[in-house]
Design a protein with these regions (language model features):
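Short catalytic/ligand-binding loop motif for oxyanion handling, primarily in non-cytosolic enzymes
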Residues: 51-53, 116-119, 124, 142-144
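A conditional alpha-helix N-cap/helix-loop micro-motif detector
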Residues: 23, 85-89, 181
Length: 286
């Protein structure tokens, strides 16, 4: 069980992954991570020849394994109009390939529209050193709002199980798959339900074990809205934090440019904010 205590001091490796033309918000997120955790290593796996003097840019094509190529060949979600679903699934395999190619054993990874507010070594929450630490979104979904692996072998095991599951789809089934039926968040939950011992689900609502909370997506959606659809104060009752926000048990707020939540008159720090609206600049810490 996780306890409230400092993690071992590490020079953490942050790994970003993105396919396609780079929106401004990704660059803002990268710059923020450099600012918040200046002693960390930052790797950006992309296909745009991105260059930054303080960030290691890794070309996706240079790290793709044969196993990943087999998954790409199946063209999951081919007929979905939004490339997000294909790219989000592919990202899991690129992440495996980059940590294995570069021999990275410990890393933090989150979606490209996430901001962090605390250096890894200042986080009080005790991450599991043997399991994959990641944010649950709902009873049916696990999301890369924030994830941390301190054990590459464990992470490889999870990705291998995802691969074993996906390889059973025929090429026709994979191409016609719809995101509403299956996506990377639901696949992660499926693997968790089959083998929960591989995962440590991070606290996304206030708990006694920690005065820190991680945002799967819910707090960012409440404070900043969702892309192209809803303004701020959006809640989804299916999200683990969403129902508590909607019922008034949790109140997210911004204080001195840092996100916090109030629960039972106690204030909890948000380690990260998943800004679904992509309005990253609005939430950059001063």
């Amino acid at each position: 069980m996780a306890t409230k205590c400092k993690n071992e001091k590490l020079q953490m490796n942050y790994i970003y992954i993105y396919e396609g033309a780079l929106p401004k918000y990704i660059k803002n997120s990268l710059e923020n991570t450099l600012k918040i955790d200046p002693d960390a290593n930052i790797y950006f796996c992309n296909d745009q020849s991105y260059q930054h003097e303080n960030i290691t840019s890794v070309q996706i094509e240079s790290i793709i394994s044969k196993s990943t190529k087999n998954i790409l060949h199946k063209e999951f979600f081919k007929y979905e109009p939004n490339l997000l679903w294909t790219r989000s699934l592919n990202r899991i395999f690129y992440l495996r390939d980059v940590v294995n190619t570069l021999n990275i054993n410990k890393f933090v990874h989150f979606d490209a529209d996430v901001l962090i507010y605390k250096p890894f070594n200042e986080i009080n929450y005790k991450f599991s050193s043997s399991k994959f630490n990641i944010t649950p979104l709902s009873e049916k979904e696990i999301i890369f709002g924030y994830s941390c692996s301190l054990n590459r072998e464990n992470f490889n095991c999870i990705v291998n199980k995802i691969e074993e599951f996906l390889i059973e789809f025929t090429d026709n089934e994979s191409k016609n798959l719809l995101s509403k039926d299956l996506n990377e968040m639901k696949i992660l939950m499926k693997i968790y339900n089959n083998e929960p011992s591989l995962f440590n689900l991070l606290p996304v609502v206030p708990k006694e074990i920690s005065d820190e909370v991680f945002d799967p997506a819910s707090y960012g959606q409440y404070l900043g809205g969702t892309k192209d659809r809803f303004s701020k104060k959006f809640t989804d009752e299916n999200h683990l934090p969403g129902k508590m926000i909607r019922e008034g048990f949790i109140r997210p707020k911004i204080y001195n440019s840092y996100p916090k939540i109030v629960f039972n008159n106690n204030e909890f720090e948000l380690i990260n904010l998943h800004v679904h609206s992509k309005k990253i600049k609005k939430f950059l810490p001063k």
